[in-house]
Amino acid sequence: MSGGGPEERRYALELDPGEVERYRMMAEQARAAEADLWDLAGIRPGASVADVGCGPGAMLPALSDAVGPEGRVNAVDADPEAVAAARALVAAAGLGNVSVAEGRADHTGLEPGSLDAAMLRHVLAHNGGAEDAIVAHLATLVRPGGCLYLVDVDGTAIRTLPEQADLTDLQERYGAFRAARGDDNRAGLRLADRLARAGLEVLEFRGRYFIGQPPPSVRPPSWAAREAMVAAGVASEDDVRRWDRAFQEVQGAPVAPTIFAPLFTAVGRRPA
């Protein structure tokens, strides 16, 4: 999801239908797996919350339901395409307590001290060098006693079994591409430390594994970054065709591939 920043920090993942479906799948799993942490962070009926780096808005129905008609959800993303997709989702679902605006994760345009909770999911890993500035800005948006809610991944530990050589190559190229951009592919491991450096009290720092077999329409972030990798010269169109054939091969196999991905969540409270 796009946090935004200088032009060279442009979000690398293409927002195609498969990527939108991946966001939706992640949102469904998150609501179930993180219910107690949402409550700890104050994401409950009547709360005013923000989803920063909201992407196409997959998390917005769950947040809208969590805060109820008396609450408010402020969604922000730096990518105009994602903002348009999120607004379309909000309109189609009739989410009257949700607004969507364009803004950067380190300059959201939201009023300081106006939120009970601010959520940032899978943004820090795509904004290498700006992580502390983003967390510091979001910390100013929550009222005293309010919470900042961070979610990210350890991308170096993601595995797919059974392995397929071409898809392993794709994942390794993606890791090298991210490193060359200055991104932190282990951002999830540092969430609690970033909250503490922003002056917040760390209430919870938790890890879990996603283990699942995504539907054929859902491919990993490395695939969504294929055009950016070609543009950067770390992959060719022949590579993209080879990787596409590999996905089709594993999707047609008798045993579907299983993804293992470590996810981390940290909740920090602003001192009263």
Predicted regions and their residues:
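A short acidic, Gly/Pro-enriched loop at the edge of an enzyme's catalytic core
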Residues: 108-117
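Conserved catalytic/acceptor-binding region of the Class I
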Residues: 147-216
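A short glycine-rich, Lys/Arg-flanked "PGG" loop and its adjoining helix->strand segment in the class I
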Residues: 132-147
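Conserved alpha-helix/loop element of class I SAM-dependent methyltransferases that forms part
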Residues: 28-45, 62
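Helix-to-beta-strand junctions that scaffold the AdoMet/dcAdoMet cofactor pocket
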Residues: 68, 127-128, 142-144
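A short SAM/SAH-binding and catalytic strip from SAM-dependent methyltransferases
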Residues: 116-130
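C-terminal helical/coil "lid" or tail adjacent to the Rossmann-like core of SAM-dependent
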Residues: 4, 9-12, 17-19, 30, ...
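Class I SAM-dependent methyltransferase SAM/SAH-binding core
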Residues: 50-52, 56-108, 133
